[in-house]
Swiss-Prot record:
Translocates 4-amino-4-deoxy-L-arabinose-phosphoundecaprenol (alpha-L-Ara4N-phosphoundecaprenol) from the cytoplasmic to the periplasmic side of the inner membrane. One of its GO terms (molecular function) is carbohydrate derivative transmembrane transporter activity. Pathway: Bacterial outer membrane biogenesis; lipopolysaccharide biosynthesis. This is Probable 4-amino-4-deoxy-L-arabinose-phosphoundecaprenol flippase subunit ArnF. The chain crosses the membrane at residues 3-23, 48-68, 77-97, 103-123. Its main location: membrane. GO terms for cellular component: plasma membrane. Keywords: Cell inner membrane, Cell membrane, Lipid A biosynthesis, Lipid biosynthesis, Lipid metabolism, Lipopolysaccharide biosynthesis, Membrane, Transmembrane, Transmembrane helix, Transport. Belongs to the ArnF family. Residues 1-2, 69-76, 124-127 are cytoplasmic.
Length: 127
């Protein structure tokens, strides 16, 4: 059950990143705070994405706390690196996020997967 909570946290935090990125592309620059706040009512879809992203972050934290209760930290924490892969792949695939494929990023993703496998692979039983 702890693994499900950890993976749920990864999926939710990845969705949060994508929603927040898309919302911030659509909305005015946040450094102009009065304009940004007044524009929230004028852009219902980006505003909904912004608040859904924040909600996804909160739910991700709840799942993470439940995962930590049930899993050793050495097993749970490496799973967070999956969010880097999910966000990168989804940002390449989803329209409007303006991500560009680069071979170096693919190599980095491969290193993340390799590291995750090295950390999480069950140790061989010794006799």
């Amino acid at each position: 059950m702890g693994l499900l909570f950890a993976l749920g946290s990864v999926v939710l935090v990845s969705a949060a990143q994508l929603l927040l990125k898309w919302a911030m592309i659509q909305l005015p620059d946040i450094s102009q705070l009065p304009q940004f706040l007044s524009s929230l009512s004028q852009f219902p879809l980006p505003t909904a994405a912004l608040f859904l992203g924040l909600l996804a972050y909160a739910l991700s934290m709840l799942c993470w706390l439940l995962a930590l209760k049930r899993l050793p930290l050495s097993r749970a924490y490496p799973l967070l690196s999956l969010s880097y892969l999910l966000v990168w792949l989804a940002a390449l695939w989803l329209p409007g996020l303006n991500e560009v494929f680069r071979w170096g990023k693919l190599a980095g993703a491969g290193l993340i997967v390799s590291g995750l496998l090295l950390i999480c692979w069950p140790a061989a039983k010794t006799r």
